[in-house]
From Swiss-Prot:
Transmembrane segments: none annotated. The modification N6-(pyridoxal phosphate)lysine is found at K258. GO terms for molecular function: tyrosine phenol-lyase activity. Keywords: Lyase, Pyridoxal phosphate. It is an enzyme of class 4 (lyase). It comes from Symbiobacterium thermophilum (strain DSM 24528 / JCM 14929 / IAM 14863 / T). The lineage of its organism: Bacteria, Bacillati, Bacillota, Clostridia, Eubacteriales. This is Tyrosine phenol-lyase. Gene3D superfamilies: Aspartate Aminotransferase, domain 1, Type I PLP-dependent aspartate aminotransferase-like (Major domain). Homotetramer. InterPro entries: ArAA_b-elim_lyase/Thr_aldolase, Beta-eliminating_lyase, PyrdxlP-dep_Trfase, PyrdxlP-dep_Trfase_major, PyrdxlP-dep_Trfase_small, Tryptophanase_CS, Tyr_phenol_ly. Thermostable.
Length: 458
């Protein structure tokens, strides 16, 4: 008999949550325009909208807040953050930002010029938007398996080397300022990249003089998957695997609101001094002094402490296994989800869940709204709404993946909460034929998934 295991932490403080009535939730989602982003958090029972900034900090992180140096310039909290990034990630230079998209903004302004192409292993919403705002064009060079929810490839986040080289041949290396490799790949279902693939991408970049950049937002989860799945890494600590992963990159953008276990903050890290200088020039305009980048000193202290906590092997094993616990319950019930189960979330396959709803009636959006009405669980659409429109044609981008993301915050919920979520999804699966499509009645010009509004189709 296998010995049971428990969360590798004790709970010191709690926040009450409440279940509401179905009638209350029907009114709430109607007032929110059937967009879960527009719900009030007090009306949500279990909040799986995102793992960004919604994590529980440790007592050490709360203690670190009191150590924050709030000096306007040269705060010692910056140097503690810099030391943590150098020690754990291995990059020479660090520029703090208010969150990940602040770092995306900086590197896009520094490296991208109009007419450039930026290859990557699947798009991410804010990343692509910043690239397009600078006149660049994102090109997806992820392996084909990433677009198949049922493909069992252990590293579905891998870059397709042939696609990458074909792009270089087509547009020329001088039109490619860098390749952006996400670790893990959010839009593919939290899927990892193998160490072997990172080495191959590095070789191509070196051959053609192209920089290799990382969106390292969930790189620790990626490192854990390498430990589990890639030969030669089973006995290595996650901390060591992460350091090797980062050694292949010239720099990274980072949202500290995920891996680093904080509520706000991010950074841009790099090895080239000229990029550091440009970043410092830009951060003063858009974020603040280069030693705070829009953050309070206390936030930099909490990020630094979180960087050390995130590479604890017991912590990251629990984090991955809690996500897996939910996903395996759904698989046992025959519910279509992205496989293998990813690092930060379970992704429902809305196409397979609601085959009667065409993609231009937003099946993932409809499923997320239905889940909230059923149980008060808030999830996120990751399909055609998130994909936005083609900036040249104005037509919808039609992604192959139409998903609902059940994103699990770190150290916040217990497995009993996961049982409630699983029960609700199973109930909806039985009632799936009653779910109707939606029409969009308000659409903002960019990042529409945040604030768009919908209504049911009769």
């Amino acid at each position: 008999m296998q010995r049971p295991w428990a969360e590798p932490y004790k709970i010191k403080a709690v926040e009450p949550i409440r279940m509401t009535t179905r009638e209350y939730r029907e009114q709430a989602i109607r007032e929110a325009g059937y967009n879960t982003f527009l719900l009030r958090s007090e009306d949500v029972y279990i909040d799986l909208l995102t793992d960004s900034g919604t994590n529980a900090m440790s007592d050490r992180q709360w203690g670190a807040l009191m150590m924050g140096d709030e000096a306007y310039a040269g705060a010692r909290s910056f140097f503690r953050l810099e030391e943590a990034v150098r020690e754990i990630y291995g990059f020479k230079y660090v520029v703090p930002t208010h969150q990940g998209r602040g770092a995306e903004h900086l590197i896009s302004r520094i490296l991208i010029k109009p007419g450039d192409y930026i290859p990557g292993n699947m798009y991410f919403t804010t990343t692509r938007t910043h690239q397009e705002l600078q006149g660049g064009t994102f090109v997806d060079v992820i392996i084909d398996e990433a677009h198949d929810p049922q493909a069992s490839h252990p590293f579905k986040g891998n870059v397709d080397i042939a696609k990458f080289e074909a792009l270089i041949d087509r547009v020329g290396a001088d039109k490619i300022p860098y390749i952006n490799v996400a670790l893990t790949v959010n839009m593919a279902g939290g899927q990892p990249v193998s160490m072997a693939n990172l080495r191959e991408v590095r070789k191509v970049c070196d051959r053609h003089g192209i920089r290799m950049w990382s969106d390292a937002t969930r790189a620790v989860e990626n490192a854990y998957f390498i430990k589990e799945r890639e030969e030669g890494y089973q006995d290595k600590p996650v901390r060591e695997i992460l350091k090797e992963m980062m050694s292949y990159f010239d720099g990274c953008t980072m949202s500290g609101k995920k891996d680093c276990l904080v509520n706000i903050g991010g950074f841009l890290a790099m090895n080239e001094e000229w990029i550091l200088q440009k970043a410092r020039e830009q951060v003063v305009i858009f974020e603040g002094m280069p030693t705070y980048g829009g953050l309070a000193g206390r936030d930099m202290e909490a990020i630094a402490q979180g960087i050390y906590e995130m590479v604890d092997d017991d912590y990251i094993a629990h984090r991955i296994h809690q996500v897996r616990y939910l996903g395996e319950q759904l698989l046992e019930a025959g519910i279509p989800i992205v496989q293998p189960i990813g690092g930060h979330a379970v992704f429902l396959d809305a196409r397979a869940f609601l085959p009667h709803i065409p993609q231009d009636q937003f099946p993932a959006q409809a499923l997320a709204a239905a889940l909230y009405v059923d149980s008060g669980v808030r999830a996120m659409e990751r399909g055609i709404v998130s994909a936005g429109r083609n900036p040249q044609t104005g037509e919808h981008n039609y992604p192959k993946l139409e998903l609902v993301r059940l994103t699990i915050p770190r150290r916040v919920y217990t497995d009993r909460h996961m049982d409630v979520v699983a029960y609700s999804v199973k109930h909806l699966w039985k009632e799936r034929d009653t779910i109707r499509g939606l029409r969009m009645v308000y659409e903002p010009p960019t990042l529409r998934f945040f604030t768009a509004r919908f209504e049911p189709i009769s």
